[in-house]
Every structure is written in structure tokens, then in C-alpha cells.
Amino acid sequence: MSTSTTFQIHYFASASTYTGKQTERLPAPLPLPQLFDTLESMYPGIKEKVLTSCGVSLGDEYVDVEADIQVMIHPGDEVAVIPPVSSG
């Protein structure tokens, strides 16, 4: 898929383990609220086991997948799925 019709998604920690990938390209445009459902269709169980506790960034800003209903992921955008981090 070319960058003119896709966006790049980066997976970190448990998201990377679950998908078996660090990055991949997905078709764009995609409404942000559909992101988790799209990933769930590709990786059954990921929504409940991983995504519900993750943060998501679009470009350099964190976004709320459920609340930001007007946000669209455009071709060439970069999205990151970021699981929670603990420190001690």
C-alpha cells in the first residue's frame, strides 16, 4: 500500500506482542472512532486484552478514540498505540 492511500500505525509493548508487528500500514482515510474496531477485525481479542488500556497518539498528540468522534486519520498520518507505563 502506498503512503498516498494509507497511514502508518506503530505498536509498542503489549500491542506489538499481540500483533506480532512493530508497525504496519492501514487504509486511509479512517474515522478515529473506527480504529479499534478495525484492529479488532484484524487481531481478534485485541480490543479487550490490549486496546482498552492503551493510549493512542495521532501525530504528536494524544487522542481519545471514543470521544474525538470528528477526528479523521488521513493518508500519511502516523498513529501510535501506547500501553500504560509503570515506573518504580
Swiss-Prot record:
Chief site of localization: cytoplasm
CDD domains in the record: Ubl_MoaD (cd00754)
1-thioglycine modified-residue sites: G88
CC per GO annotation: molybdopterin adenylyltransferase complex; molybdopterin synthase complex
Top-level taxon of the source organism: Eukaryota
Gene3D superfamilies in the cross-refs: 3.10.20.30
Keyword field contains Mitochondrion: no
Family label: Belongs to the MoaD family. MOCS2A subfamily.
Name under which the protein is recorded: Molybdopterin synthase sulfur carrier subunit
Gene of this entry: cnxG
